[in-house]
Amino acid sequence: MSASPNSLIRIGRGEHTFEWLENWAVIPDTPEGRADGRTHGVVVTDDGRVIVFHLANPAILVFDAQGALTDAWGDRFPGAHGLTLVKEGSTEYLWLTDYKTGEVVKTTLQGETALSLPFPDLKGYDDPKYAPTWVTVFEERFGGNGDIWVADGYGAGYVHRYDKAGKYLSSMDGTAGAGRFRHPHGVYVDSRKTDPELYIADRMNRRIQVYDLDGKFKRLVSDAVDTSACAFIPHGDFTLIPEAPYRARLTILDPDDRVVATLGENDQVCTRAGFPNDRALVEPGRFVTPHSVATDEAGNIYIVEWITGGRITKLVPVK
């Protein structure tokens, strides 16, 4: 990490060098936002708007390309968590998960409900309760059939599958793979491959499990040992993985799942007093609890963290 001549902070190296823009955008200064306000999800729309899902009302915040708040909605998400952007034809939609209410809903960018997923048709779901954390879709624009996977990361530790109409199909728990999931926090269908694969952030087991789309185990991501993966997104040929709470960094994988860079690494913060929510731990150029990530057409990266009061950072590639 180094300071550039104009006092901006630079992180990374080689082709993965970025300028760090601290507080590129901020959540509204409200009592609820100051008391909690943890920023859990982020996506970027085709027209460059940055949408953030956070733990305060309204839960959805919409920022323009300069980081100014332009819209906000959503007063029914007390457990605002995973946020996924999908596209059907020319229309963009959001998938949102709420780990407190168990709601998994697809909405328009304006917040109108397009589809709600039913409770998983699985016995023994009273204790623990259903607490979904993330959604991924095998999108038709990438040659998929529209099937939906939901990670129950804070509940019973399953990954559930639905068809594109929202009909429950099946569940998996990891026992057919590397072992029972513990907090399967994030899920991601990698459609870039000839044979698409399902990546699962098996977070408390500190590993990433990879399956084919029929649920057959393929491998562990061996180069991401002792990981703390929260989520996944594609970035050109690379995959970006925010890691917390056992690590604090943004990891970049190449197409062969090899770690080629880590950004904002700050693993020592994970054992400091006040972790993970004390804002005194925040230091420009280093992450505390990176939870979700998104990119835009220019290659900029946006990272949100679950720290109290929220944190929205923009990384600008250095050409």
Please describe what each predicted stretch is:
Residues M1-K319:
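Eukaryotic scaffold repeat domains enriched in small/polar residues
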